[in-house]
Amino acid sequence: MITAAMNQAARETYDSGGDLPAKGSRVWVTGFTREEYDAGTRLLELAGFLPTAFATGADAVLVPDPPTAAIIEDSERLGRKVLVLGMFRDAAKPPRRRAALEITEHSVRILDVTIERRSADSSGLLPAERFAHLCLDATFLTAARSVAIAAHSRLPCALEGDTAVTKTTAVLWVAHLCRQEAVRLNLNGQSDTGELVGRFVPNLNHAQGSPAAWRFWEGIVPDAMRHGRWVVLDELNLAEPQVLERLNPVLEQPPSLVLSEHTGERFGLGGDVAVAESFRIFATMNPAEYAGRSVLSPAFRDRWSLWSVLESPGEKEYRALLTRLVHGVHPQFVLDGVEWRAADSSPVHPNLASDGRIDGLLDAIASFHVAVAAAAGGDSGVTLGRARRERYVFTRRTMLAAMSLLAGLVDRGIDLEAAALEAIELVYLQRVQPGPDRQAVRSALRTVGLGR
């Protein structure tokens, strides 16, 4: 039993707590009703913290005021700061609210950037279903904003970030919204200049036995320059640097190109072919630390006028994605004093929304995913699959696959929690080797209350 003296000592420790934890710290929110919990997490987000429903890995705890002596003592023992709502209510000024996305017949606004929308023509465009799973959170819309600025200013734009942070999707989505045709080329270590600018290929339509058995195939870049398409070069730094340097004149302002591989046809000002007004070029890549990546020359990097390095998602972003999939609700976020949120979309898995246990399950899935992703190669080092030459990878795609399976199993009449365990077994557990690695994943499941 906690004595009155212990209670007073604990209270004095709390009262002398000093400054708030650093921005970006994970804060465990506990002891509140659901309505109070939502209000508390909102205040934490406005103040720059990362709220979580789980104690594991938290730097601080947010509790009702006054906090109990047990909470204070436990937090002091773990080196965890104790916070109450009053610390944030006074400082949190209600930000101005704006819709994160606005589409009219002739324009698209992404955050604070408005770009032109082409006349209606569905030919060559990606279908809307391609983007049904998108969660319009701060990271994704910031990337899309960079793409929109590049499109408006006719500047080459590169997006760099970890696997599955929606780099390519951001470019293709903006192109889709603008009714702009985009062509995508996945580069690799075997890519050559022929894929980019053109090469001679067999002329299969020519009369058999004719000496003119070859024709010049125009590569993806000059073809896009001629017809006004957007070019998306995926995995840019997997290609050899000398191959990429062939694009240097295309990245200049204004863009140009000489097809020396053929007849010397010149694209650009004063040339044989005018570059179409709507031509744009984009690139995506993983950081150079990834295996097999080339180090790009400073001169080549400098030619990409806009270069955006994207943040990797954390528990907050994964949880928002799950909410989007099940409820169709996009998250609110604050940038530069403005609170943004996109209008609700059709949920991808509406059959899950009616189960009263779903929100608690989504909390657990998000925390579990973050735990295994970090163990497989987070900032603190690899603890899962340490002896393997090829590390395990758990990304947004992993979670999307698990949720798709979960929804399908529930449709077949399987109980929600049983379906969740089955989906996780198939997508996560079977991905790792039996033995210590699989035991570690099961342990992560038990930590969030899902395992047996």
Language model: regions and residue ranges:
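AAA+ P-loop NTPase catalytic core and its hallmark functional loops
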Residues: R96-G378, L405, V410-D415
